[in-house]
Amino acid sequence: MTLHPDLALPSPEDFEQLSPEALAARMNGPEGQGLPGTLGARLGIRYVSMARERVVATMPVEGNRQPAGRLHGGATLALAEELASVGSWLNLDPQRQVAVGVDLNGTHVRGVSEGHVTAEARLSYRGRSLMVWEIEMKDEKGRTTSLCRCTCNVISMGA
């Protein structure tokens, strides 16, 4: 298993030298458009802040709607898993381990038809082989739109 060639995950030194916002800018890629060829880039996900126990990103509604004109639930869940996976990676040795989503659920409590959503993922459990993240999405008015939970499995790169 190899990571995306343009992906420059933060090193332990980066956490001491860079702010959560600077780490997020690194994940947004050199053009600020996300990492080419990834689902996150296609969905328009942009990182705002990244830390080992909290990751924040935004995603536009435009381009991610279902036929009725609202934000697609699948796009919302993809955003949740993206943040949980990246947040998990921040807690690993990226040369030896990777984290992948193995369980994901979400409850959509309010529809969104314009603007963007902001997602905040918080680490709620960290074990040797599993990490569990709680992700809350809000609209531009600060109203909760979805509540999600994602479990990531930690695996060795050679596995």
Swiss-Prot record:
Q: Per UniProt, what is one GO molecular function of this protein?
A: 1,4-dihydroxy-2-naphthoyl-CoA thioesterase activity
Provide the coiled-coil residue spans: none
Instruction: Name the Enzyme Commission number(s) assigned to this protein.
Output: 3.1.2.-
Q: Which GO terms describe its cellular component?
A: cytosol
Q: Which Pfam families match?
A: 4HBT
The answer to whether keyword Hydrolase applies is yes
**Which InterPro entries would you find in this protein's record?**
HotDog_dom_sf (IPR029069), PAAI_dom (IPR003736), Thioestr_dom (IPR006683)
Q: Which UniProt keywords apply?
A: Hydrolase
Q: Top enzyme class of this protein? A: hydrolase
Report the family membership.
Belongs to the thioesterase PaaI family.
- UniProt-recorded name of the protein: Putative esterase DR_2406
Organism of origin is Deinococcus radiodurans (strain ATCC 13939 / DSM 20539 / JCM 16871 / CCUG 27074 / LMG 4051 / NBRC 15346 / NCIMB 9279 / VKM B-1422 / R1)
